[in-house]
Swiss-Prot record:
Name of the encoding gene: gag
Stretches of the chain forming a coiled coil according to its record: none
Sequence motif: PPXY motif, positions: 109-112
Top-level taxonomy: Viruses, Riboviria, Pararnavirae, Artverviricota, Revtraviricetes
UniProt modification remark: Specific enzymatic cleavages by the viral protease yield mature proteins. The polyprotein is cleaved during and after budding, this process is termed maturation.
Organism the protein comes from: Human T-cell leukemia virus 3 (strain Pyl43)
UniProt motif PTAP/PSAP motif: location: 98-101
Site (Cleavage): L123, P124, L337, M338
Keywords of the record: Capsid protein, Host-virus interaction, Lipoprotein, Metal-binding, Myristate, Phosphoprotein, Repeat, Viral nucleoprotein, Virion, Zinc, Zinc-finger
Function (record text): Matrix protein p19 targets Gag, Gag-Pro and Gag-Pro-Pol polyproteins to the plasma membrane via a multipartite membrane binding signal, that includes its myristoylated N-terminus. Also mediates nuclear localization of the preintegration complex.
Keyword Transmembrane: no
Lipid attachment points (N-myristoyl glycine): G2
Gene Ontology biological process terms in this record: viral translational frameshifting
InterPro entries referenced in this protein's UniProt entry, alphabetically: D_retro_matrix, Gag_p24_C, Primate_lentivir_Gag_pol-like, Retrov_capsid_C, Retrov_capsid_N, Retrovr_matrix, Znf_CCHC, Znf_CCHC_sf
The protein's name: Gag polyprotein
PROSITE patterns, per the entry: ZF_CCHC
Amino acid sequence: MGKTYSSPVNPIPKAPKGLAIHHWLNFLQAAYRLQPGPSEFDFHQLRKFLKLAIKTPVWLNPINYSVLARLIPKNYPGRVHEIVAILIQETPAREAPPSAPPADDPQKPPPYPEHAQVEPQCLPVLHPHGAPATHRPWQMKDLQAIKQEVSSSAPGSPQFMQTVRLAVQQFDPTAKDLHDLLQYLCSSLVASLHHQQLETLIAQAETQGITGYNPLAGPLRVQANNPNQQGLRREYQNLWLSAFSALPGNTKDPTWAAILQGPEEPFCSFVERLNVALDNGLPEGTPKDPILRSLAYSNANKECQKLLQARGQTNSPLGEMLRACQTWTPRDKNKILMIQPKKTPPPNQPCFRCGQAGHWSRDCKQPRPPPGPCPLCQDPAHWKQDCPQLKADTKGSEDLLLDLPCEASHVRERKNSSGGED
């Protein structure tokens, strides 16, 4: 049986290696215009074909979709032919120059009327062939997939903005959809600050004037919810994204500010953790090197701080700080070195026991002298257990036992015989 492919769980399929993101977005937008919608098998075959097409010499930048269509093998599985055909139809509209004021009215001020041909849109705003644009709300699997992509990034960081910007280009959400996305991705405090910045940007945009905006039709947020108002929806999406970069700062202490070097952690590992945390936590456009140098010294352990202070490199370039701390040994290695026995030289003074030099008293082979005279003979040269009198008394008792009278053997035999006769 053939392999079955279900609908894609990730709403933003990964781009093939070597293909630019904006080119991959064009292919995705064309794929989502297919009726019925594309399946996971279609995306799999599209990625497989693009990986092979990138290696061919006819691959150009910008992409010539007509030449790319000739590279598709006959009876190629999937709907790659239809996707490339949609891109070929949209190529003239994308390459058309912007409209200019007519020659008979050179004083006509901007903005000039938009081009009649518009870019293809994706979910949740649907553009079926021959029917007006309709709206489809977010699905939970879409929100979960986007949140999984930004789970390790702080709001406003480059990774966060790249993922959210790609999702906005992919799904073309309305103002209500963007509000739901913000509530799902960020905390209530971040959402409140974002809402304040967004209201300020909307007020400035309404004052300056936006192409297609009619003040009599209601606020910009209401008009951007209309699926047919593509231009206003794009303007609102740009303002919504700009509100992240205008945030005054993190609502709580950033995670990278609490990263400290452990007492036994190498300095290079600590700096690597700091670098990864700053990449995921700094707002977009914030310089990273000054913050990294400052935290590399202020959050280091006491040993590394003393080493950097002694060399005068508390605010030096990061490479010099790493070289300065290369010779630092963690505490666990110092403990091992301290446990090893040290070879001490023999003393020059005489031993307290034998009076000879060359060894310590604890290593002396001469027995320890008695603490006082022997209680038996009052001789201070030996212990009681070694006293000669004690040994003499023991020997005398043995001699007394040997001097006891004993009967001869013939006398015992005579007694035994007489007793037996009786």
